[in-house]
From Swiss-Prot:
The keyword Hydrolase does not apply. Required to supply glycerol-3-phosphate in the chloroplast for the synthesis of glycerolipids. The active site is at K299 (proton acceptor). Pfam families: NAD_Gly3P_dh_C (PF07479), NAD_Gly3P_dh_N (PF01210). This is Glycerol-3-phosphate dehydrogenase [NAD(+)], chloroplastic. It comes from Oryza sativa subsp. japonica (Rice). It is found in: Plastid, Chloroplast. Its main location: plastid.
Amino acid sequence: MAAAAAATFLPHTPTPRRRLAVAVHSPTRRRLSLVFSGPPDGALSVAAAEEKADAGEEAAAAVSAPRGGGGGGGKERRRVVRKAWEKLVRWSRSWRRRNRSDVVETTRKVVVLGGGSFGTAMAAQVAAKKADLEVSMLLRDDLVCRSINHSHINCKYLRDHRLPENITATTSASDALAGADFCFHAVPVQFSSSFLEGISTHVDPKLPFISLSKGLELNTLRTMSQIIPQALGNPRQPFIVLSGPSFAIELMNKLPTAMVVASKDKKLAAAVQQLLASPNLRISTSNDVTGVEIAGALKNVLAIAAGIVEGMHLGNNCMAALVAQGCSEIRWLATKMGAKPTTLSGLSGSGDIMLTCFVNLSRNRNVGLRLGSGEKLDEIMNSMNQVAEGVSTAGAVIALAQKYHVKMPVLTAVARIIDNELTPKKAVMELMNLPQVEEV
């Protein structure tokens, strides 16, 4: 279990995988084939090649060891597990040496658009990479600017955390964007188009935009990969999306986190991976921009549904059934739009869904919880100082589902509750009364 858990945080290699089959003969004379996956032969270090040679011998020892917790068999299994772990660590170190990049060394300035909790956390994450890296936050609030520049604290979000001194804030787009090597976009989706149009004259056409915003534009059904180039008037604007299970507060506390960057430009994704990766943040890469964006948008709506179930005290059985159904609905729509199924079971899919649906730090889950407890949506939204993207995304999701002819009963119910056309209690009754069908 330790090895499996640790594998989540080991470096990701974008190179093709090689499969090595080892035939092992057990004492019962039944032939067992074990398959090992690794980098292509050209990427193997000498140490890895040597380790490959005795893999069959150790596998045979593990298979032939007597069952049970005691005796020599237990010691042998522990020895095999220990050696496997040591090999994993050696491979990790070797991979890091081979894949060192000068991205961090050559990056002089990064700009962050937006001063919310996640934009602030990402600014701190990047600023910690090296002391002479200039990180400029473009904000609209003069008070927050002064707080960051004078006290190194965002007085509005994450107030208990001091920011690195190489982070500065400004309300001037020209000052913030001048000479930037990378741009992190952390403005809520519904405000992104107008915001970007306002700063477009200051944006270098080759400046890579890394989107942190999750959701769909309500009236147009556009994702950020469509909004950014269109708002900037540059269809070739380099674009990357960053997503995955991550709360800003835990990033600030340097707790272990894993995320994914997706871009159609493989080299650009690898560059952003190197820019962000740290001992507490593991970054994987993907070329499935559609899958990462759609999963990130739809999980917010599902989180509202999960919160409603919690607020109504409907129990764990109901919660599990609802989230499972919601995951299926997300898969149906995303794959129709061209997403890869593997993306939906990865960090930006299942990982982000689990975090957002089951953890109280989730804004969207808390909106649902309060709706399920009987509060009115207007009261809930007026009491929040941050945006819950799932509220505005819900209607767009259903319009998108109709466009692609996909039935989404759970997410449709959320949209109707938000529009005040259905009470949570009535929604549950109608969902439970749907026809008993074959699971797909």
